[in-house]
Amino acid sequence: MKYQLTALEARVIGCLLEKQVTTPEQYPLSVNGVVTACNQKTNREPVMNLSESEVQEQLDNLVKRHYLRTVSGFGNRVTKYEQRFCNSEFGDLKLSAAEVALITTLLLRGAQTPGELRSRAARMYEFSDMAEVESTLEQLANREDGPFVVRLAREPGKRESRYMHLFSGEVEDQPAVTDMSNAVDGDLQARVEALEIEVAELKQRLDSLLAHQGD
């Protein structure tokens, strides 16, 4: 597969894909915006604490690989970045809105069940039911230009198998989780996290509006 992203590259691209949909008024993102998005505590696994220089290094590498492009010029005092990873004018990778939502959530959080993905991707795309989530995952797993996701072996006590993206190479199944409480509470945790994401983004928008009013 021609797409081979490191963990940090996957985080940066996932953040840009997410913000392009959820906060379009703040997109493209500056370096500081990307740092904030990479290090935010909601909808991220693992939570990171990247420095500006670390993020800048990833941005430079991704620009060289044509996965991102810089936006500058009249009206832009600082360089900003937008993704060319998918659905760009000259790129080969074309994804539907549902596919973008799932891929983004997998890039940001790693392996997840369809139920977790539906809750956590809700800010990007509203799936009508679980069947739509599962059919979209199957499409991503069986695309001629893919596969882009893989279904992992079901863990003991879990009702659903987890899926993982393949943009960082082949995936080895992680050791099985035996904590039954984790299995039972997974969907509830995902719904709580989705609400936390929504609150954080509303706060971010409010802060941005207040900053503009103060100018």
From Swiss-Prot:
Modification N6-acetyllysine, positions: 80
Entry keyword set: Acetylation
SUPFAM superfamilies: Winged helix' DNA-binding domain
Domain of life (superkingdom): Bacteria
InterPro entries according to UniProt: DUF480 (IPR007432), WH-like_DNA-bd_sf (IPR036388), WH_DNA-bd_sf (IPR036390)
Protein family: Belongs to the UPF0502 family.
Protein name from the UniProt record: UPF0502 protein YceH
Natural source organism: Escherichia coli O7:K1 (strain IAI39 / ExPEC)
